[in-house]
């Protein structure tokens, strides 16, 4: 397939600051006022490009918490993103969604090209701020054919009631949320129940994430890709050839 542009940024009125007071004094003042008003809105949110036609392949959204404390985890994750499309070449399209700096700043077009996905991941940097998983879930809900959202994160700092509503809607649509939960920081463990609550509502699950074990992460992502294409049936058929399949199936069984 032909790749679309990397990502498109759109205004997010809810998170944009109020416009600066009008100034007088000529062209320079008017220019400063315009920049103050428009730049925060332009860079506040991201969504994938508008779609033409109906997707022909299953889709997966690879979502990552790239706040400042997450740099070690993101460094590990960006090295193995290609596993998502290499597991079943040509059978799954993947989009990269990233939040950092208290906003979703990246939501790429869907692609099944491993090099394209790796290049897009390489360009992401971590920024300090609160988590923004829910806007990623909301945007994913509007996309067609998304079978799985796999999210790497440690804490949840948003509205749980809103998260539950989104998770219920994703579940009705047939989109599973799979969370790779990083508990390297002991304070993150308190959010395990929250992530399980959201994931189970979609029919998904939560697995532990270890930034120091990139090989295991690659195995898990490969298994998630197979699950996105063929569900539990295909995952069970390939469990002997996929090192991550057994772990994923074990955690999927825990949701029941």
Label every model-predicted segment.
Residues 96, 177, 203-208:
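Conserved beta-strand scaffold positions in the cores of enzyme catalytic domains, especially
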Residues 90-93, 144-148, 173-178:
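Loop/turn elements at helix/coil->beta-strand transitions in domains of secreted/extracellular proteins
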Residues 206-256:
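C-terminal "exit" segments of structured domains
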Residues 55-152, 156-161, 184-191:
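Von Willebrand factor
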Residues 155-201:
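VWA/integrin I-like adhesion module and closely mimicked acidic/polar interface patches used
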Residues 137, 146-153, 192, 196, ...:
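Extended, alpha-helix-rich binding/interface surfaces that flank or overlap catalytic cores
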Residues 2-61, 68-75, 90:
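Acidic, polar low-complexity linker/tail segments
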């Amino acid at each position: 397939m032909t790749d679309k542009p990397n990502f498109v940024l759109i205004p997010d009125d809810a998170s944009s600051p109020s416009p600066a007071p009008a100034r007088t004094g000529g062209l320079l003042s008017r220019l400063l006022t315009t920049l103050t008003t428009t730049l925060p809105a332009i860079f506040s949110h991201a969504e994938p490009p508008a779609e033409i036609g109906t997707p022909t392949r299953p889709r997966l959204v690879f979502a990552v918490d790239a706040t400042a404390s997450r740099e070690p985890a993101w460094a590990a994750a960006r090295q193995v993103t290609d596993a998502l499309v290499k597991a079943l070449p040509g059978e799954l399209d993947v989009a990269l969604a990233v939040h950092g700096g208290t906003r979703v700043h990246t939501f790429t077009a869907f692609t099944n090209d491993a090099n394209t996905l790796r290049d897009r991941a390489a360009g992401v940097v971590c920024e300090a701020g609160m988590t923004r998983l829910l806007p990623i879930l909301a945007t994913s809900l509007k996309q067609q054919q998304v079978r799985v959202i796999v999210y790497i994160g440690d804490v949840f700092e948003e509205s749980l009631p809103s998260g539950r509503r989104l998770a219920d809607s994703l579940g009705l649509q047939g989109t599973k949320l799979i969370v790779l939960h990083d508990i390297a920081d002991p304070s993150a463990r308190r959010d395990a129940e929250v992530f399980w609550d959201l994931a189970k509502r979609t029919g998904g699950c939560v697995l532990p994430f270890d930034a120091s074990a990139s090989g295991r992460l690659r195995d898990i992502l490969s298994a998630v890709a197979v699950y996105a294409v063929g569900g539990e049936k295909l995952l069970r058929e390939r469990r002997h050839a996929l090192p991550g399949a057994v772990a994923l199936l074990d955690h999927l069984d825990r949701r029941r």
